[in-house]
Each structure stands twice: as structure tokens, then as C-alpha cells.
Curated annotation (Swiss-Prot):
It holds the Pfam family Robl_LC7. GO terms for molecular function: guanyl-nucleotide exchange factor activity; molecular adaptor activity. Gene3D superfamilies: Dynein light chain 2a, cytoplasmic. GO terms for biological process: cellular response to amino acid stimulus; positive regulation of TOR signaling. To M.jannaschii MJ0310 and MJ1340. InterPro entries: LAMTOR2-like (IPR037587), Roadblock/LAMTOR2_dom (IPR004942). This is Uncharacterized protein MJ0714.
Amino acid sequence: MVESMIDRVLLELNRTDGVKGSMVVGKDGLVIASQLPGNVDAELVGAMASAAFGAAERTSSEIGLSGLEQTMIEGEHGKTLMVDAGEGILVVLTDAKVNLGLIRITMKRAADKIKAMF
């Protein structure tokens, strides 16, 4: 039930211009829900995103920043953005030219909806 509700949020998020796909992973790296393109290994991306977000949280804490809001990995062909979603991490894959302001607002709203489901 919760998974199908999360899938609806992800499908809505995926309609944002520049978004290639999205998923929610547990802090342990296990996939909770995924709406990624077929050529993307959700299990692998979920595990790696969880590890990257966890490392960013630890780094943020170590240097005195409180409450990590977002982590972004930027490459030549796109970006991977991660935000805290309560019991999970919202991961969004985008193209290189995505409007970061728009995607950040859209992700915040989606993460708030997902947090309310747990």
C-alpha cells in the first residue's frame, strides 16, 4: 500500500522537465520504490546512493553543519540528487541541463509527502 503511494509520488516527480527517473531507498540501501529507466540497475544505484548520502551526512556532522538537506553528484551527462525522506532517501536522476531551483523545490515537496507516509 505505502509502496504504491510512493510510486505515485515518484511518477509525478518524473514528469518534471529534465528528470530521468527517481527512487526511494532505505538508509540501509534497500530499494523501497523505484521509477527508474529500464537500463538503470535500481539495486546498485540504491546501494550506492545510500552510501553516498550516509557519507555526506557524516561529513556534514563532522564539520559542524547541522541537518544535511541535499547531496548532489554532478557528471557530464547528468546529476543525481538525494534528499532525506524520513525513513528513506529520495534519489532523483536528471539530465545535465535540469533547472536546479525547480528540481529542489519539487524534490522537497515529494520528500515531505513521502515522510508523511511512514
